[in-house]
Amino acid sequence: MFADIAVQHWAFAVYVVGAICICLTMIGLAALLGGRAYGRAKNKPFESGVDSVGNARLRFSAKFYLVAMFFVIFDVEALYLFAWSVSVRESGWVGFIEATIFISLLLVGLIYLWRIGALDWAPKKRVLTDKKPD
């Protein structure tokens, strides 16, 4: 039984062993051929020649995280739609109805996010004051 599995998957085993060998070779050559500079100054973090002042932790607005989450969510949904579009002939009308329901749920979610203001980048107060008078 093990022989049958080994015969079927020998190419994958060769690929894995080759990938591991290439990685180990690159790490070994970098360790052997890489430049070495020891000293007290090398242990300090690089700050572009300027002594660091203050806290290194910067706070980002939650809007950046929202944009990233929306991108991931809608990108994954686009992958599902792409997979459906490749097999649209095999799935027939049932697949079409399922894709329509899926797209409808996406639109409902997008409308909900738009209504609660999650897609507004600037606060309402600033948007209203930045408009130019006609």
Curated annotation (Swiss-Prot):
A Pfam cross-reference name: Oxidored_q4
- Compartments, record wording: Cell inner membrane
Keyword Transport set for record: yes
Gene Ontology cellular component terms for the protein in this record: NADH dehydrogenase complex; plasma membrane
Membrane topology (UniProt): Multi-pass membrane protein
* Main location, first listed in the record: membrane
Q: Which GO terms describe its molecular function?
A: NADH dehydrogenase (ubiquinone) activity; NADH:ubiquinone reductase (non-electrogenic) activity; quinone binding
- Describe the reaction catalysed, as an equation: a quinone + NADH + 5 H(+)(in) = a quinol + NAD(+) + 4 H(+)(out)
Q: What is its EC number?
A: 7.1.1.-
What stretches pass through the bilayer?
12-32, 64-84, 93-113
Q: Does the keyword NADP apply?
A: no
The free-text function statement in the UniProt record for this protein reads: NDH-1 shuttles electrons from NADH, via FMN and iron-sulfur (Fe-S) centers, to quinones in the respiratory chain. The immediate electron acceptor for the enzyme in this species is believed to be ubiquinone. Couples the redox reaction to proton translocation (for every two electrons transferred, four hydrogen ions are translocated across the cytoplasmic membrane), and thus conserves the redox energy in a proton gradient.
**What protein name does the entry list?**
NADH-quinone oxidoreductase subunit A
Native source species = Aeromonas hydrophila subsp. hydrophila (strain ATCC 7966 / DSM 30187 / BCRC 13018 / CCUG 14551 / JCM 1027 / KCTC 2358 / NCIMB 9240 / NCTC 8049)
Write the gene name.
Answer: nuoA
